[in-house]
């Protein structure tokens, strides 16, 4: 899902949905937009290579977009276990912050907030429409943005997963 958010390309998501729809009906999945820990990029890079997408630069793009490093990015996440050599890292952040509610809210951009809220609701509606058990992690049910106070606690400061555990 977050690949689709960052790239605005639904082809990988469509492929995954097609594969899942062919599985036996007695399979049950837990469906969620984010995890209590972090989001990893276990994407189908063999498929993506058909479109000229290479794993390391693509992971860097996803991480840069979803941490707000691109000027047109609305997302505000943080990396966990960043390994620049491999271009791999895990992503942390609440769904609201990754959808832009945090950025546009702090900027006082009501039009942006409205768009980000629609984005958040759309992603949750998509997740809820999937076969399986929907899981909504702490704070996402109320649109909670990232909590940066973990950085004030020396015991937690080095672990960005506390960003969305608040």
Where do the model's predicted regions map?
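Active-site and adjacent substrate-binding regions of carbohydrate-active enzymes
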Residues: 1-166
């Amino acid at each position: 899902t977050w690949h689709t958010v960052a790239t605005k390309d639904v082809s990988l998501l469509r492929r995954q949905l097609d594969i899942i729809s062919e599985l036996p009906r007695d399979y049950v999945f837990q469906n969620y937009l984010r995890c209590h820990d972090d989001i990893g990029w276990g994407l189908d890079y063999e498929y993506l290579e058909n479109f000229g997408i290479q794993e390391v630069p693509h992971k860097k793009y996803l991480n840069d977009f979803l941490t707000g490093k691109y000027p047109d990015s609305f997302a505000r996440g943080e990396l966990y276990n960043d390994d620049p050599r491999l271009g791999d890292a895990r992503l942390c952040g609440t769904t609201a912050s990754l959808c832009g509610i945090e950025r546009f809210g702090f900027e006082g951009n009501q039009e942006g907030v409205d768009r980000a809220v629609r984005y958040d609701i759309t992603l949750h509606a998509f997740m809820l429409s999937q076969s399986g058990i929907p899981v909504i992690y702490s704070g996402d049910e109320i649109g909670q943005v990232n909590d940066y106070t973990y950085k004030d606690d020396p015991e937690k400061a080095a672990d960005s997963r506390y960003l969305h555990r608040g």
